[in-house]
C-alpha cells in the first residue's frame, strides 16, 4: 500500500488535481507584506511651511486686518479669484490707460482669443 502511495505521489502531476493549474501570483498569502512603505515627504515645502502664517493677525490685531491685505502682488489681483479671461479684463480696466502700447495690444489680443475660446468650448457655454 505504501509503495502505491509513493508511486502516486511521485507522478502526481499526471493525475488531475483539485486545485488550479495556473498561478494567481503569490501562492502563500501569509508571506506577503501588506504594510505599505512610509513615504518620504518634505515637511518644510512651501504649502506646509506657510500653513497658518497669518493666524497671528487675528489674535494680535483684534481681527481688523484680513490676510488678503498683506499679500504682495499686483493690486488688481489681491484678494480676487477668477479665470484667465476675467483676470485679463480686470487688468485692462485697472491699468489699461497706463500700459505701453504693445503690451495693451497683446492684452487685447489675448482677451479676444480667450473670449472666443470660452464661448466655443468648455463648460462655460
From Swiss-Prot:
Does the keyword Metal-binding feature in the UniProt annotation? no
Give the UniProt family note. Answer: Belongs to the mitochondrion-specific ribosomal protein mL51 family.
Where in the cell is the protein located? Mitochondrion
UniProt organism field:
Xenopus laevis
Instruction: Write down the Pfam families for this protein, in alphabetical order.
Output: MRP-L51 (PF10244)
The residue span given for the transit peptide is 1-29
Q: How does it assemble?
A: Component of the mitochondrial ribosome large subunit (39S) which comprises a 16S rRNA and about 50 distinct proteins.
Question: One GO molecular function term?
Answer: structural constituent of ribosome
Q: Name one GO cellular component term.
A: mitochondrial large ribosomal subunit
Protein name, per record:
Large ribosomal subunit protein mL51
Keyword field: Mitochondrion, Ribonucleoprotein, Ribosomal protein, Transit peptide
- Main location as per UniProt: mitochondrion
Q: Name one GO biological process term.
A: translation
Amino acid at each position: 500500500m505504501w509503495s502505491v502511495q509513493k508511486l502516486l505521489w511521485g507522478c502526481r502531476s499526471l493525475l488531475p488535481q483539485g486545485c488550479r493549474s495556473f498561478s494567481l501570483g503569490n501562492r502563500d498569502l501569509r508571506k506577503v507584506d501588506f504594510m505599505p512603505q512610509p513615504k518620504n515627504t518634505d515637511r518644510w515645502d512651501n504649502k506646509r511651511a506657510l500653513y497658518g502664517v497669518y493666524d497671528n493677525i487675528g489674535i494680535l490685531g483684534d481681527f481688523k486686518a484680513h490676510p488678503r491685505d498683506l499679500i504682495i502682488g499686483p493690486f488688481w489681483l489681491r484678494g480676487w479669484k477668477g479665470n484667465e479671461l476675467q483676470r485679463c479684463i480686470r487688468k485692462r480696466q485697472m491699468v489699461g490707460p497706463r500700459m505701453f502700447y504693445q503690451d495693451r495690444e497683446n492684452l487685447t489680443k489675448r482677451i479676444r482669443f480667450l473670449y472666443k475660446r470660452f464661448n466655443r468650448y468648455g463648460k462655460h457655454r
